[in-house]
Amino acid sequence: MPRPRKPANPFRYFHSSPEVIRLVVMMYVRFSLSLRNVEDLLFERGIDLCHETVRLWWNRFGPLFAADIRRQRVSRMRGFRHWRWHLDEMYVKINGEMHSLWRAVDHEGEVLESYVTKTRDKSAATAFMKKALKRHGSPEKIVTDGLRSYGAAMDELGNRAKQETGRHANNRVENSHLPVRRRERAMLRFRRMKTLQKFASVHASFHNHFNQERHLVDRQTYKLDRPGRLAGACQLGPCPQSQDPARWRRVRIGLTAPVEHLLVQEIVAATG
C-alpha cells in the first residue's frame, strides 16, 4: 500500500522565514500601503527586501492564506439562525472601462463573496448569487437595492420571497465598500479583471479575520482579542517541520498581558 504523500511545503525554495512572508502579506493586504511603503516599514524593523519581493509574495501566498482563513470561517457560519445577507454592486474602472464588483455581506459585517463582471444584467446577478449560495448556504433574508437584476435572478433561483428592499436598508454593505475604495486608490487602480477578482477575495478574507466590530466592544475586550487575531494570521498556511510549536504557545501565554506588540517583536527577532 503506498504511503500517503505529505502536502508540499509552499515556503520551500524561499530563503526568508515563513514568519516574515506572512507579515509582509498581512501588511500589504490589510492596510492601504503601496509596495514601497511596505518595503520602507520593514526596513525600519530590520528586514531588508525589495518592493518587487512584496509583489511576488502577495501574488504567491495571498490566495493561499485567504483560502486558509475562509476554510476556518465558512463551516462556522452555515449554522447561523436569522441570517441576513446584504447584496450590492460597485463600479470599478479597469483600463478605462467600467466593471461591476458584486459583494455580499451579512448582518454582522462579514464579507461573504466578491465577484467581478463586465455587466450588471440578470446573468451576472444569477452567477454571483449561485456562487454565494453554493459556498455559504441559504440565508433567512436577502436585502438588495432596487436593481431589477436581483429580482430576475431570485425568480430564476426560486427565492424571491426572501428579498427585502427599502430606503437605507442596505447601508451595511454600502459602508463595507469603503475599505475597497481606499485600497483601490493605494494600488493606483486595477489593470485586469483577474487582478481585481483575486484582490477582492483575499482582501475580504483578511478583513473578516481582523474585523472585531470595534464599535460594539469595550477597550479592554478589544485589547485582549487583538493579539489573538494577529497570532492566528501569523500561523496561516502549513507550518514547516522545523518550526517550534512551543514558540507559538509562548506567544499565546503572553496574549492576556497588555503587551500587544509581542508577536511582531518575536517575528522581527527571528529574522535578525
Regions found by a protein language model. Give the residues of each.
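Intrinsically disordered, low-complexity basic tails/linkers immediately adjacent to helix-turn-helix/homeobox/MYB/SANT
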Residues: R73-E97
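Active-site beta-loop-alpha junctions of metal-dependent nucleic acid enzymes
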Residues: R60, S114-R135
